[in-house]
């Protein structure tokens, strides 16, 4: 969703990541999948199962693999060494105010209790300052006390294009401007250029994940998404084609893409913002499936690594809860109907839309129960730590299935392994 932070537009990360489950019997040693033109792996977990192929992707890019190029039991072994707090921390994305990573965040990273960090415009003053901050995080992650030290942190931001960019540089065109280009083939070229440009830009800053592209199909001029030109088009076929091009180009550039906000916020009016208050999208199930969810089919086929789920309520999809707290939507729609096998990610856990759902720890528990893999604690390190506490307690008590929990962490590590440090 969209919020203001540090005097600039800040889109709260709303992405849902979920990649299947690695079993110990992945690939017999020696694992040399990268040398094979086609690698097929069965991924299991949280009710998802898929065969993953690398046949059509660019060699050497993260798009070429849905799991690490060298498949082994390394992630499984790493997970087996983790404490409850470390397991919980791998599922939390932290944010922090200001220009310097707080000492508490660095301590948590050194202890192996952080999965990633999100950056906003308020974290940026200059290239040298920002890259120094990234270096501090990377140095902490390399600590010998961190069992996940061999796995790069998920370092992400919202670099959508146009007005919604946290860092200077590409992509300069907004989604709406790209969607207005004629013919469609030219717009597809522009979307690919935006994806590859964003990837190169983020990599130059040391980041490896982007909370983009937006796949919402907006309805009217001035709507929530259209206000900042965050939607490609009112036509789902156009959003589908351009979003998939962006995803492929970005991931060929070794940056994980995140499509959002499933199952769609395109019908939200200019006054409807889940960051601020509850939002209900009163569309029929048929409209949501055939229009709003439509672009996700192509993104999934393109191998998108992450999906962010909306905090809006969609009563005609069988739930009175926000989508990210609803197994009917996360499991029923995204996984079972559309066949998504990747990682899921929440929007900001501190969103106003969740006011009725209690503490950060309780919201986190409800999201995890619904099938959300990564929790976005973007407001502060304290908020991220509260999310960690909720997950740790649920693991300890068995409120969340421990085997499934470890499987999610294994898949998070698999994604991190596939990304450049």
Where are these regions (language model features)?
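Glycine-rich, aromatic-flanked loop segments that form ligand/cofactor-binding clefts
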Residues: 141-173, 195-218, 239-264
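Second-shell loop/turn segments in exported
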Residues: 62-65, 94-99, 119-126, 177-193, ...
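Active-site beta-loop-alpha junctions enriched in small/polar residues
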Residues: 97-99, 122, 160-162, 214-216, ...
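N-terminal hydrophobic targeting/anchoring segments and the immediately downstream early-domain regions
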Residues: 2-166
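Short acidic, glycine-rich surface-loop motifs adjacent to enzyme active sites
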Residues: 108-127, 211, 221, 300-320
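Hydrophobic faces of well-ordered beta-strands that scaffold small-molecule active sites
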Residues: 89-96, 114-119, 153-159, 209-213, ...
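Second-shell residues forming the walls of enzyme active-site clefts
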Residues: 104, 129-142, 146, 238-396
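Mid-to-C-terminal alpha-helical segments outside catalytic/metal-binding sites
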Residues: 390-393, 399-421
């Amino acid at each position: 969703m969209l919020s203001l932070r540090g005097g600039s537009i800040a889109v709260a990360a709303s992405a849902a990541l979920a990649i299947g489950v690695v079993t110990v019997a992945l690939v017999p040693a020696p694992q040399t999948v990268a040398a094979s033109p086609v690698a097929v792996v069965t991924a299991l977990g949280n009710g998802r199962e898929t065969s993953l192929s690398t046949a059509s992707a660019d060699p050497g890019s993260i798009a070429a693999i849905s799991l690490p190029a060298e498949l082994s039991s390394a992630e499984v072994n790493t997970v087996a060494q983790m404490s409850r707090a470390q397991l919980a921390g791998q599922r939390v994305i932290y944010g922090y105010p200001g220009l310097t990573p707080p000492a508490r965040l660095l301590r948590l990273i050194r202890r192996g209790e952080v999965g990633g960090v999100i950056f906003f415009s308020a974290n940026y003053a200059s290239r040298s300052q920002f890259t120094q901050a990234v270096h501090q995080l990377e140095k902490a992650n390399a600590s010998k006390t961190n069992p996940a030290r061999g796995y790069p942190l998920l370092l992400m931001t919202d670099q959508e294009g146009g007005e919604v960019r946290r860092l200077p540089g590409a992509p300069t065109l907004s989604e709406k401007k790209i969607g207005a280009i004629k013919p469609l083939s030219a717009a597809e070229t522009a979307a690919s250029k935006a994806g590859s440009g964003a990837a190169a830009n983020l990599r130059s800053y040391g980041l490896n994940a982007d909370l983009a592209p937006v796949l919402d199909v907006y309805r009217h001029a001035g709507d929530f998404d259209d206000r900042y030109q965050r939607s490609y088009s009112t036509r789902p076929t156009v959003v589908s084609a351009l979003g998939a091009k962006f995803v492929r180009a970005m991931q060929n550039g070794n940056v994980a893409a995140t499509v959002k906000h499933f199952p769609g916020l395109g019908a939200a009016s200019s006054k409807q913002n889940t960051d601020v208050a509850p939002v209900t999208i009163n569309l029929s199930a048929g409209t949501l499936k055939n229009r709003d969810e439509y672009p996700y089919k192509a993104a999934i086929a393109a191998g998108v690594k992450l999906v962010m789920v909306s905090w809006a309520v969609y009563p005609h999809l069988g739930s009175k809860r926000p989508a990210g707290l609803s197994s009917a939507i996360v499991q029923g729609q995204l996984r079972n109907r559309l066949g998504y096998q990747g990682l899921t990610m929440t929007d900001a856990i501190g969103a106003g839309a969740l006011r009725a759902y209690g503490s950060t720890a309780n919201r986190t528990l409800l999201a995890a129960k619904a099938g959300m893999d990564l929790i976005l604690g973007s407001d502060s390190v304290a908020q991220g730590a509260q999310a960690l506490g909720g997950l740790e307690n649920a693991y300890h008590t068995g409120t969340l299935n421990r085997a499934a929990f470890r499987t999610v962490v294994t898949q998070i590590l698999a994604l991190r392994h596939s990304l450049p440090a």
